[in-house]
């Protein structure tokens, strides 16, 4: 019987538009990503689909196209929220790989240590770790 949701995916799985399959290398260096599916390319070599795993989560990548554009001049439409056992090490690795700091990694009033980065493809990533339980 065919499963409507593949075992390795969840009800919501992010799919990021990137310039090409070379993005896999950045995500491997920045976040320890592993490629878990072969690259599916179109007739002209453009990236159609690939899947990577970061920690326990799958992220799909697709090539940039007119169908995968944010509204001109509008705010970002999504931010990747990630949690790490060692957020400081994850942060340093991502910055060393070329991620741009949007706001620095620091202890937050809501009980997390976190900050926000932008990858070379324009996607924003929050890196966090819960450091204390706080009632909000």
Descriptions of predicted regions:
Residues 1-17, 24-120, 127-136:
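Vicinal oxygen chelate
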């Amino acid at each position: 019987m065919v499963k409507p949701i593949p075992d390795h995916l969840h009800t919501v799985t992010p799919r990021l538009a990137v310039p090409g399959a070379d993005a896999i290398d950045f995500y491997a260096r920045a976040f320890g990503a592993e490629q878990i599916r072969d690259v599916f390319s179109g007739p002209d070599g453009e990236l159609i689909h690939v899947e990577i795993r970061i920690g326990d989560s799958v992220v799909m990548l697709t090539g940039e196209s007119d169908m995968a554009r944010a509204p001109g001049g509008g705010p970002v439409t999504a931010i990747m929220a990630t949690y790490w056992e060692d957020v400081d090490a994850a942060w340093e690795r991502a910055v060393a790989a070329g991620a741009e700091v949007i706001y620095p990694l620091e202890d937050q009033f809501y009980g997390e240590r976190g900050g926000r980065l932008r990858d070379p493809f324009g996607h924003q990533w929050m890196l966090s770790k819960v450091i204390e339980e706080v009632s909000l």
